[in-house]
From Swiss-Prot:
Residues 187-407 form the ABC transmembrane type-1 domain. It comes from Bacillus subtilis (strain 168). InterPro entries: MetI-like, MetI-like_sf. It comes from the Bacteria. Its main location: membrane. Belongs to the binding-protein-dependent transport system permease family. GO terms for cellular component: maltose transport complex. This is Galactooligosaccharides transport system permease protein GanP. One of its GO terms (biological process) is maltodextrin transmembrane transport.
């Protein structure tokens, strides 16, 4: 049997493969790490894996939510342990392979220098990775797991245990009448809202940037400063101000602006269609300054030679706009425009702060202006439908990621980068 095979076989117990290769210090390190792992995390792994499979067996002793969280932590810790275990196996195999080829093994000093040179990036990024795992990955895994349980108001620890129900929650979204109708109504409005609001802010921002960028326009700095001022005001403050302006009872929109033109007051807050229109207009106001600023930078980077050549060829102003300006702007800004659509698809703040997703809709668990993310919030915080909210979150994430990836792949900027 070759050295590499013997070393790999012995490495089933961490460190023994290194001992076989006469790498004593490295063997002690791996043996210590293996023993310490089970000594420190043994109880966590035992309780965690029991909890994640059973979700508890006795009330009120077992809290299913805590057991699920502990089980997910146990899975994460196990992944780290398996990674170190793989390094142990690979190291023993590679050293055994060197012995089979009659090559000298690296000295302790050489191994130390190799670890310092090759492992430095991992050491530096280690704390960030740790924070990422427990601030991002852990909540994602926890939400993902909840979607496959029956966790709701009637199955809520510590009074009740929760159970694994597989894909039943996902099936309920499409088979239970109230959930199905609400889901498709909210999804339809979410798509309309995303397309309308994003298109408005992008179109307005690019249009104003083109106007202000004209060579014969005076006081450009003044106009640019005025147009980016809405971006300087915190978004939540602007939304609350607009909520007051559109208020049916005392808002300036009805009592001052519309009254000045002799128009009767409109139900901005109590009619779903008017509320939706107000939200789209508000997002156009909130979002156009950023697009205006980026578009201005793109326009200033377009070479004047292109316009001069077009003028010599007899191109009109609109021809220059169509064949030079807009293509250059859209190619450069395609990723930014896509992120604007993605952001608005999940734009919770404006929906919640304006009127809480209202007005209420008869026979629906969502309000007239609720988008998917605000509906998920209501299901969690008001209805205690935790598993349903988690399932909707998964569907929402898959939908947004799929659309965003498809859009990125269709853009010329993505193809040129590839």
């Amino acid at each position: 049997m070759q050295h590499r095979q013997v070393a790999l076989l012995l490495s089933i117990i961490p460190g023994l493969g290194q001992f076989y290769n006469k790498q004593w210090i490295k063997g002690i390190v791996f043996l210590f790490l293996g023993a310490s792992f089970f000594a420190v995390f043994g109880d966590l792994l035992n309780m965690g894996f029991w909890g994640i499979f059973t979700l508890g067996t006795e009330v009120p002793r077992d809290n299913s939510v805590f057991l699920l969280a502990e089980g997910i932590i146990a899975v994460i810790v196990t992944c780290f342990g398996l990674a170190v275990y793989y390094v142990n196996l690979r190291d023993a195999f590679q050293s055994g392979k060197q012995r089979d080829e009659n090559k000298p093994l690296s000295s302790l000093k050489e191994q130390y220098q190799h670890i310092i040179s090759e492992g430095y990036p991992y050491v530096v990024s280690g704390p960030s990775l740790f924070i990422l795992i427990f601030a991002v990955i852990f909540p994602i895994l926890f939400s993902f797991a909840l979607a496959f349980t029956n966790y709701d108001l009637y199955h809520s620890p510590p009074a009740k245990l929760i159970d694994w129900v597989g894909f039943q929650t996902f099936a309920n979204i499409f088979t239970v009448d109230i959930w199905r109708s609400t889901f498709f109504d909210v999804l339809a409005w979410t798509v309309v809202w995303t397309l309308a609001a994003s298109t408005l802010q992008v179109t307005l921002g690019i249009f104003l940037a083109i106007i202000v960028n004209q060579k014969d326009l005076r006081f450009k700095r003044f106009f640019r400063t005025i147009l980016i001022l809405p971006w300087a005001v915190p978004g939540f403050v602007t939304i609350l101000i607009f909520a007051g302006l559109f208020n049916d009872s005392f808002g300036a929109m009805n009592h001052d602006i519309l009254a000045f033109f002799g128009i009767d007051p409109l139900p901005w807050m109590t009619d779903a269609n008017w509320s939706r229109l107000a939200l789209i207009l508000m997002q156009g106001w909130l979002g156009f300054p950023y697009i205006f600023l980026v578009s201005t930078g793109v326009l200033q980077s377009i070479p004047d030679d292109l316009y001069e050549a077009a003028t010599i060829d007899g191109a009109s102003v609109f021809s220059k706009l169509r064949y030079i300006t807009l293509p250059m702007v859209f190619i450069a800004m395609a990723p930014i425009i896509i992120t604007q659509f993605t952001f608005n698809f999940n734009n919770f703040n404006i929906i919640y702060l304006f009127n809480g997703g209202g007005p209420a809709v008869t026979g629906s668990t969502a309000g007239g202006t609720d988008i998917l993310v605000s509906w998920i919030y209501k299901l969690t915080m008001q209805s205690s439908q935790y598993s349903l909210a988690a399932a909707l979150t998964i569907l929402l994430s898959v939908f947004v990621i799929s659309i965003a990836l498809w859009q990125f792949r269709q853009t010329k900027s993505f193809k040129e980068e590839a």
